[in-house]
Regions:
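Intrinsic disorder/low-structure terminal segments
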Residues: 12-14, 40
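Bacterial N-terminal signal peptides that target proteins for export
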Residues: 1-9
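Immediate post-signal peptide segment of exported/extracytoplasmic ligand-binding proteins
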Residues: 21-29
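Short, intrinsically disordered low-complexity segments
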Residues: 4-5, 21, 80
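C-terminal segment of classical bacterial N-terminal signal peptides
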Residues: 14-22
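Short, glycine-/small- and polar/acidic-enriched structural segments
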Residues: 26, 36-107
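Hydrophobic alpha-helical segments
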Residues: 7-8, 20, 39
């Protein structure tokens, strides 16, 4: 009986924490770039953020230069799932060094 109480308590805590995480997510903008693989990744990210974390997600049209520039100057969109960073590498690295942007992975 004691282990059943522990399991129930753990479940209640787990679901409570999950609800808080969903409430804190807010609205996230994702760049839907103008090539097929990037469009696919944007939709996968949208699905994960909406279904897994309860976020409100808005897909915004994008292309390499305008999206990178907007991210560096305005902080939007929040996510660019696939971006040809070598075309804007120096400016992006500077924005990262200044703390305005973060790479999800080093490439």
């Amino acid at each position: 009986m004691n282990s059943i109480k522990k399991i129930l308590l753990s479940s209640v805590l787990l679901f409570g924490i999950n609800s808080v995480a969903k409430a804190d997510c807010g609205t996230i903008t994702i760049a839907e770039m103008n090539w097929a693989s990037a469009e696919m990744f944007a939709h996968v990210d949208k699905l994960i953020l909406e279904e897994g974390y309860g976020c409100d997600v808005e897909l915004v049209p994008g292309d390499t230069m305008p999206t990178a520039t907007s991210m560096m100057e305005k902080g939007e969109p929040d996510v660019a799932p696939e971006l040809w960073i070598n075309s804007v590498r120096i400016a992006l690295d500077a924005a990262v060094d200044e703390g305005r942007l973060h790479y999800a992975a080093e490439v």
